């Protein structure tokens, strides 16, 4: 995880060249600026890399890279987590014992739960933070993680064979 400037600044060209020389860049995922709030509001990116290796990852010059940007902010501007509410799933009948009936969520959320009865809980009874990084227990939409897994399979990356 690096501040986004490290990937863009001309003064950091040496870092980019070092990474490209020693690793295959698998993915670059831009995180929302609120992810690390309240500690910092600097926009960051996650760089997924695989060290060049003759057997597992032979060096090649031209290859595709997965790019994605987090759209759901997961925290408000003060750094408070935003949780998924039951009423955001209008098209489904949410039953306490069967959370698998949840349909596609609507993208309207509020932070700081008032009553736990209003919020969607995962299979462990925990609140679900709104984000688009991965599908949470099958209760939320597929996210960046699932898209990367499909990319990795399509590209026949060694860790998905």
Regions found by a protein language model. Name each.
Residues 2-161:
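A conserved structural/catalytic subdomain of Rossmann-like adenosyl-cofactor enzymes
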């Amino acid at each position: 995880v690096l501040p986004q400037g490290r990937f863009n600044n001309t003064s950091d060209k040496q870092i980019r060249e070092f990474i490209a020389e020693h690793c295959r860049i698998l993915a670059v995922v831009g995180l929302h600026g609120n992810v690390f709030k309240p500690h910092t509001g600097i926009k960051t990116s996650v760089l997924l890399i695989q060290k060049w290796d003759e057997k597992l990852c032979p060096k090649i010059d031209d290859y595709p890279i997965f790019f994605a940007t987090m759209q759901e902010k997961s925290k408000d501007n003060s750094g408070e987590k935003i949780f998924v509410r039951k009423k955001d799933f209008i098209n489904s009948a949410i039953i306490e014992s069967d959370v698998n009936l949840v349909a596609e969520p609507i993208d309207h959320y509020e932070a700081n739960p008032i009553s736990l009865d209003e919020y969607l809980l995962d299979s462990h009874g925990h609140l679900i933070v709104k984000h688009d990084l991965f599908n949470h227990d099958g209760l939320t939409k597929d996210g960046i993680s699932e898209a990367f897994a499909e990319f990795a399979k399509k590209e026949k990356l060694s860790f998905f064979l």
